[in-house]
């Protein structure tokens, strides 16, 4: 089984004016496609791993041959992270229900959660991601470098937990529109969070 680039459930301009069409198209068809291609190439000689869903593969990095571990950490990680990212974007959804209640319980308020998430995203040096994760029965905000995922575990990524939502803070995710203004990009994210997807992921794991 080869990994394939997932189709987006919306047009490239669907998130305007918050996330621009050009960035979305390049990000999806160029950057994400490259992660898919590189992961598939690395897996050609690893048939015992090639049929695993990418979310499962990245939990087994310590089982990979040493010469494949880094390339798959980066590229299978990139494929998994971006696949989640695209599904997590949609205009016009509302934070409500069990997920909202859990955020208020674990962060004190929605505003406190947003402030903590924005800080994690803005302070991640270089390239990486900010995440809302479920650890056991508690929500937490974490960040990872490069294309690391919380699914890789603390020993590899420095974070753990089941991702509920994530924000890509690589420059390729925002530079065409926001240049070096990462905090502005992070603020715009709240206008396109797919809270329905986040709630579904939370409900599946709580």
UniProtKB/Swiss-Prot annotation:
Q: Name one GO biological process term.
A: removal of superoxide radicals
Alphabetical list of InterPro entries matching this protein = Mn/Fe_SOD (IPR001189), Mn/Fe_SOD_BS (IPR019833), Mn/Fe_SOD_C (IPR019832), Mn/Fe_SOD_N (IPR019831), Mn/Fe_SOD_N_sf (IPR036324), SOD_C_sf (IPR036314)
Q: State the needed cofactors, names only.
A: Mn(2+)
Cofactor binding, note field: Binds 1 Mn(2+) ion per subunit.
Which keywords describe this protein according to UniProt?
A: Manganese, Metal-binding, Oxidoreductase
Residue sites binding Mn(2+) per the record: 27, 82, 168, 172
List the EC numbers from the record.
1.15.1.1
Assembly mode: Homodimer.
UniProt feature coiled coil, ranges = none
Q: What's this protein's function?
A: Destroys superoxide anion radicals which are normally produced within the cells and which are toxic to biological systems.
- In its keyword annotation, does this UniProt entry include Oxidoreductase? yes
Q: What is this protein called?
A: Superoxide dismutase [Mn]
One GO CC term on file: cytoplasm
UniProt-recorded Gene Ontology molecular function terms: antioxidant activity; DNA binding; manganese ion binding; metal ion binding; protein homodimerization activity; superoxide dismutase activity
Under which main EC class is this enzyme filed?
oxidoreductase
Per its record, the protein catalyses: 2 superoxide + 2 H(+) = H2O2 + O2
Q: Please give the organism.
A: Escherichia coli (strain K12)
Task: Provide the family line.
Answer: Belongs to the iron/manganese superoxide dismutase family.
